[in-house]
């Protein structure tokens, strides 16, 4: 991201005004060298704003091309990197740093509100839905650490030390400013609040994402698809969550796939798990746990290298 910014010139301010742009205080807006005001139209800005240079053209499916810039959007305390396209934001974007080459279109609202750990530090009542074996999720959670925290409750001093280390990580990531990485796509999404989004992530049609981290990167991007509703979560690299999945207080490990209206609460899914159609409540899904069937309900169990068959209903 460009670290060299300057104030707007009087001519640039007049150009922006002629393009129906407004600002609470034009002195609070800084731009990168190479900034061209012609690519900012119908924008409302408040707080401290930083804008990059808009030179890139996005090639969209079907052959459509859109030039980077800001069109029909309201921004408050936002840094926009070079070559981003932000268009048709129904409400506003507030308190975010946005990397380079990111495409945001047709979204309702994207905000960071107050200090947040972005899903880090959330307690998940795994293995016992009434509590007692809670695990604090964080970006680097492993199956081994989670196993010890859940099953070694007879070692309270060790559990206390583990929680201290996790809280230290939570403190290091807690911020009042959210982050959207470089080359991210967010399109046709609804409500996004207190979510950290890594590089090359694609969010397409998600309904609601609240208090979470999506740890995507260039080599293992994350896809969040249509109709997804997520609260208090962490999604690790290379995973996909799509097709109407609803999940709350969940950790999704690397290369996992959740889809086809899967529902999960207070559960941990470690690497290479797959969940479709069914339900999960308070489960510890170790690596390669798979469930495909609508009639499958997994509750308060620990699994690994398992394919749950049709009718695996643990509520009976």
Language-model region placement:
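Domain-scale signature associated with acetyltransferase and cell-envelope carbohydrate enzymes
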Residues: 1-316
